[in-house]
UniProtKB/Swiss-Prot annotation:
InterPro entries: Cdc20/Fizzy, WD40/YVTN_repeat-like_dom_sf, WD40_repeat_dom_sf, WD40_rpt. A motif (D-box) lies at residues 384-395. It is found in: Cytoplasm. Belongs to the WD repeat CORT family. GO terms for molecular function: anaphase-promoting complex binding; ubiquitin ligase activator activity. GO terms for biological process: anaphase-promoting complex-dependent catabolic process; positive regulation of anaphase-promoting complex-dependent catabolic process. One of its GO terms (cellular component) is cytoplasm. Pfam families: WD40. This is Protein cortex. Signal peptide: none annotated. Its main location: cytoplasm. WD repeats lie at residues 108-148, 149-188, 198-237, 281-325, 344-380, 384-423. Keywords: Cytoplasm, Repeat, WD repeat. It comes from Heliconius melpomene (Postman butterfly).
Amino acid sequence: MDRRTFDRKTNNPQRYRLDRFVATRDSFSETRRRRSWHAAFDVHPVNNDRWSEGNLKKKNYIKYLDKAFDLESPDKNKSIKRMNRLWPCIPRKKTYLSSADSILDLPTYSYAIYPELLDWSNDNMLVAALGSSYHKWSWRSQSLIGHGFAEYEIQCCKFDPRGELLALGTYMKTLEIHNNSKSKKIMSNTCKCLEIDNMNCSITAVDWSPTGNSFAAGCSGGAVTSFTRAAKLISWRHLVREAILLIRVSPNARYLAVTAMNTALVLLLSWPSLEMYSSIDSDWSIRAICWHPWRSALLGVGAVTDDLQARIALWNAPTREVRDTSIGPKGYRLDSMLFSHRTGELVLSMWHSDRATLHPKTCSQLVVLSDPDTMVDQWGEGRSGLDRVRTMIFSPDGTKLATATTDEDLIIWNFLPEDNKMKKTKCRSFSALPECLDNAMLGYSLR
């Protein structure tokens, strides 16, 4: 049976095996299928796991009793909490995280070497790049609305902040810029590895500046390039031997964070000149990096130690101050992390390797943290069916979360309740001036 991108999926990994005694998923109504995903299978949670749903309910009930009997001083505890908090956050007061209406298919995604083949534009359009083609799916109409093609196999993709352009990093050192409305290539450029280092590479990571007037690209040869919006070269720099895994431009358009595959190093470069500013060299394996949207340059770094202990570090770029802490019980690997631009909460995708062989699958969790010691929401403990999450992306309004898994599922989650009222979701005072300079200089910063 042919599989198409963004087709609705079944939870069964043997989805095309037919059994005359078992009704197929398509024979049930859509409402019943959605309920079955929420329920999945009942699995006993692991004891002594502080991230279990039972422990979360107990903790909330203890807080309720303490407040009811006035057994603590709220003002004192809140002030201490603010002093110890590693990142700014307005945590939720009740749980919202649940699977939404859509479980879609991502054929061949499990074979992709680099995870960032999924993005969500500001006009509520999801794009999935698979092979040498990309497919666009509308959240409003819940349907596939278009597709486009690249000259070579696509390794990564990213919409510009305005939703007008789509940057595609491809094989054979080529970076393509496509018009979003027409789904056609309008410009392209190449990495300078072949000219300078006599090495053919692939574009493995891409990210836009906050204004969309410039963007960065990393390659499999360990080099990083900055381009203007018109794909004109600004600067090129060779950094490491390993392939670049992730690159992130800071909210104030002054820094570029870079990490490579299977390394313990995070580099901080000035943007867009790509001059070395600072670095973190740890004993961990770096898995994820993301900037906090409410601060000018606060970088979150997710990693895993040799004894399988997940850790996060918060790096204040201007002061070069680093604070790190352990996250969760041992045995969990951190695969992806994001800060919510609505609440400031940190979302982690965790994977337990010892449970990966169990059936039904109980190896993955999505965890929402307000600080390293406080889990305010989670999905996965006591449930099954969620495979390892390789990448995540928020919807423009921050109420939905899209995840791509190794089981080739694209799952849309309810992250926050929908609110039709316009809210101020970003603290612009920290980045207004740098973004103004970035806008005026078309990606160049004069310092």
